[in-house]
């Protein structure tokens, strides 16, 4: 090799290379940190053990819903029924609890109801070739209607019910300052278990890899011999069952519910997933990103409350954030040459 030729050979570049698709997730990290800093600077309560504890305890159900919504969105689909499934399972669960049915059996029934709606959605999508939007819109109205038929009253758990163990607060650090303890409850533990399950399921199982493949190109996944139809059933079955689990955590924490509970929660879940960096057209995303997105969504509630802003403005902010993150995703994909 001549000296001239040798000079043309460039050494491989070293150092960290940022994946463009990670930009929306990193943006969510920055936004979350800025929101915490702003809240602390203006109100002095956001970098406190009590605030962090409340954030997780009060929004454990949203973390579960975010994981649930990640699955269909990764395939380019969506599950609009999760909020309505929360309603139907909450109403049925409270009715059964007040009738004296053991708590463990009530929870099993609630999960089975969610699974039935997920199975129905999967059937509509795979056997009747419905778009996920239409299929889950149908199951959303069905679940919401059934919840209203069963009861329109505000239902509460009976005294001494066995659901209370989910909401019982466990202190990790007993801070002498008022409302500044580091604590959690079983609902938070359930949410964290769901996050771990979602991570392992998506990144360390064949079904998880198939989900990403479907999001990339369903036709290509089918040509590769992947079990696309079975995977679609699993996706919507899992999503709906997790929605029922979110209902258990929420109703146990609040102690009551009615047929209108969960209205708009499907949009909160979608917002969490999109803000967390999952591509809305499918094929790329992380469960941990969705969890981060749910925390960004959750912190909006105390922020708007502390600013004295009407609750309606929270919805506007969420809508704008979804718009910004979808545009950011499209821009990143365009730069990367992805025409999907």
From Swiss-Prot:
- Top-level taxonomic group: Bacteria
Q: What Pfam family is a match, any one?
A: BPD_transp_2
Annotated GO CC locations: plasma membrane
What subcellular compartments does it reside in? Cell membrane
GO MF annotations in UniProt: transmembrane transporter activity
Membrane topology (UniProt): Multi-pass membrane protein
Locate the transmembrane regions by residue number. 23-43, 49-69, 73-93, 101-121, 130-150, 182-202, 234-254, 273-293, 307-327
Q: Which UniProt keywords apply?
A: Cell membrane, Membrane, Sugar transport, Transmembrane, Transmembrane helix, Transport
Assembly, per entry: The complex is composed of an ATP-binding protein (FruK), two transmembrane proteins (FruF and FruG) and a solute-binding protein (FruE).
Task: State what this protein does.
Answer: Part of the high-affinity ABC transporter complex FruEKFG involved in fructose uptake. Can also transport ribose and xylose, with lower affinity. Probably responsible for the translocation of the substrate across the membrane.
> What family does the Swiss-Prot or TrEMBL record give for this protein?
Belongs to the binding-protein-dependent transport system permease family.
Please give the name of this protein: Fructose import permease protein FruG
Please report the organism this UniProt entry assigns to the protein.
Answer: Bifidobacterium longum (strain NCC 2705)
**Gene symbol?**
fruG
